[in-house]
């Protein structure tokens, strides 16, 4: 195998396998390594590519040295010592999004942010479909991007994580946005500024930047080539809220589009998502009627502030996708404002090095009891114990029982962990499913 053209894929999950399939189809020589003994796709890989070198259980410096280019899966940090060493030597280190960007010519809408990106990506995809466009919604949501290159759609709508953006250099989007920023993945970034810098890469070579007017610190120092299109709940913006006939309505540059009561989801974070989707859709020239029709019909995504059921006049919400402090804060604030009573919060898991103190004010205002689960329960307790009643549970079943005992008519039980799930569950979907099944069995 000629090292002059050898590509080494680091990480063999769904993304790594999609990179292998892409390179194999192009007849490009490659090898794969994963520090795990049994990475998720290794059995599929050896069946399909029995003659391709696969190193499991460690990273091979020798193989990395032989590579002309390294494709890094988003789960592997650029700070990984052997990877950092290759970067310092000037080796090309890319991700699957970069490989994708080099090989597509169709317009791209690109979306990132700490919270709401899956919802906004989904909604923009639905708006495209409503306008009769053939669209592929992919990236950090659903299928890996490299599986969507053929057959080619009219449009791509990509959800992108900070990890994916770090290894992307050639993305040229028709429109791109950072929805918001709050602490997340601080186990991978030294500072919040480093995390923001990774996110800001989405605006490189973007034709129409879409910006959050309520968080100008994200974008105000960036050198845009074109005037941004803005959305915001509080500050002046192209897409905003306005009072009209004693109703709060969505407006575009002062023109009333629709009252928010026509939306099935109209809590604050849902409204921010709707405004962002309208701005992105406008940049993609989707007719306004199609966009408003989609917003009226949209009833949310599983595990994202999803209403589960009412039991003894208590409402249960599954926000298992609340894997960081900002997401949980937004969920507490939105549901707290809407609740007749108070909130009982189920939280905890793997905190990823986050600072939990931004939860204090909303917990104090809306939450009468917190049931803690998972390995970082002690850190959450340390932050919140002066503010509200803290209880512990060893399982989701016990957490749901304890929260039901603490709740009374008009209260809301909210699962929004502010943490990753891997200490107790396969992923956040599994955690949300266990919560939902437990609630439905009450």
Swiss-Prot record:
The gene is murD. Cell wall formation. Catalyzes the addition of glutamate to the nucleotide precursor UDP-N-acetylmuramoyl-L-alanine (UMA). Its EC number is 6.3.2.9. The keyword Nucleotide-binding applies. Signal peptide: none annotated. It is found in: Cytoplasm. Gene3D superfamilies: Mur ligase, C-terminal domain, Mur-like, catalytic domain, NAD(P)-binding Rossmann-like Domain. GO terms for molecular function: ATP binding; UDP-N-acetylmuramoylalanine-D-glutamate ligase activity. GO terms for cellular component: cytoplasm. This is UDP-N-acetylmuramoylalanine--D-glutamate ligase. It catalyses: UDP-N-acetyl-alpha-D-muramoyl-L-alanine + D-glutamate + ATP = UDP-N-acetyl-alpha-D-muramoyl-L-alanyl-D-glutamate + ADP + phosphate + H(+). Belongs to the MurCDEF family.
